[in-house]
Curated annotation (Swiss-Prot):
GO terms for biological process: carbohydrate metabolic process. Disulfide bonds: none annotated. Its EC number is 2.4.1.25. InterPro entries: Glyco_hydro_77, Glycoside_hydrolase_SF. GO terms for molecular function: 4-alpha-glucanotransferase activity. It comes from the Bacteria. This is 4-alpha-glucanotransferase.
Amino acid sequence: MTPFSKALRCIQNSPAKQSWKTLGIMPKHGICLPLFSLHTRNSCGIGEFLDLIPMISWCRKHGFQIIQILPINDSGEDSSPYNSISSVALNPLYLSLASLPHAQSVAYANAKLRTMQQLSKLPYVHYPQVKAAKWEFLRDYYQYVVKIGALKDEDFEIFCEKEKYWLRPYTVFRSIKYHLKGAPVNNWPKAYTDIKNFTEFEKQFQDECSFFSYLQYLCFQQMSQVKAFADDNHVFLKGDLPILISKDSCDVWYYRQFFSSSGSAGAPPDIYNTEGQNWHLPIYNMHNLVQDNYTWWKARLRYAENFYSLYRLDHIVGLFRLWVWDTSGNGKFQPDDPKEYLPQGTDILTQILRASRMLPIGEDLGSVPTDVKETLVKLGICGTRIPRWERNWEGDGNFIPLGEYSPLSVTSLSTHDSDTLALWWRHAPKEAQKFAQFLGMFFTPVLAEEDQKHILTLSHKTSSIFHINLINDYLALCPDLVSNNLKYERINMPGTVSKNNWVYRIKPSVEEILTHDAFNANIADIFSKI
């Protein structure tokens, strides 16, 4: 039996079989693009929801079937999409302002929009300016829609009633935060940390709650429009749902019974970080989650299903076991016994699969126990393969042949947390030389465009079912489409607090990508060979 036949049998006998029906099991090809990095002529300083629509058309034209985005949840004052203040609510910063109904009715609308659109010409996302300008516009806009009675719109009322499980806690939390000038929860007056006063908070901040509810309604409308367009064009949207949530979030504030303050999640020491990492993210109270039948998780999934056909589960191994730091700075896996962590992970992932039609894709990079990887296969859940890291680490250290990847996987040359391919080639020449030899290529210290294209082509021909690369790695095929300093093509440096994290802006506009003859010819050439 071939590996593909084995994978097919696994899928057919797995809890994920219903999730696979929409996508099918034939090879799929896609791009990963951070929404904040996009810009069109209408974008107001940051990528916006409706900027995805022309990219969907481009994907269909060139043979890409998947667009993967990073998390788009509301991250409050933080620029990291992985440090959200809500596990469900979308980020109003991504609203396409120029496309809002009645946007032109805002005082000095055209002048304000033009000023914000100029921010898209900066080489990076300038969050302070973007946030100040967009929030001012949204508040002016909201005053107008209140004036014309839009809050009485039946669709808005239906939305608020349907989504009240997460929407009410989010809007109250957001309102208190605004009232306290963005202060983190641990600095709030004691009265605001007691959710027994929740109904009183709703009354106290009624107008603010309505404002934040209406913004979520607008986010829902625009992302639903994107999803409908993607469906019509046979392009699948892939979201990103981190398994952990910020301690400064409405989830931890309101659903505190599902979280534990006994420790914080992180990563154990390894060869790259001898002290390990403390992410300062709260851990779950698994007992209470189970007792509540995973209602909190199911609510996240059911809302995300409005927008995505599949999604990345960041740090999926954490659903089995987490590296937990105690208050004394000591760390250990919880639980540590396979007899505990395998049933725990299997149970929650089975519940997750039953809760929606979306297909989860596991981010299982780093040190993952073999029994966890085997369990993911039995569940019908794909893992992730980064060719430069796929090596026989327990043996001779050689690279694993591209044709030997499990079909139940996604191949990606780079991630948002790594160097792009061309940057890694320069930063790690010894490793890159070994990689070139493995691929049968002549090594040069600087990765030539033709070699970049060859490696991209190979990445689309691995035995994985899914092949999804960062748009940065495709843009590098044309030097005029990337920064002269390749370090600015990197999206994030994990474990650092840096002004360069999460500010990456794609150099060309979406309009320029669509009309760049040399770039599009390169994409066509890649697809002609796979």
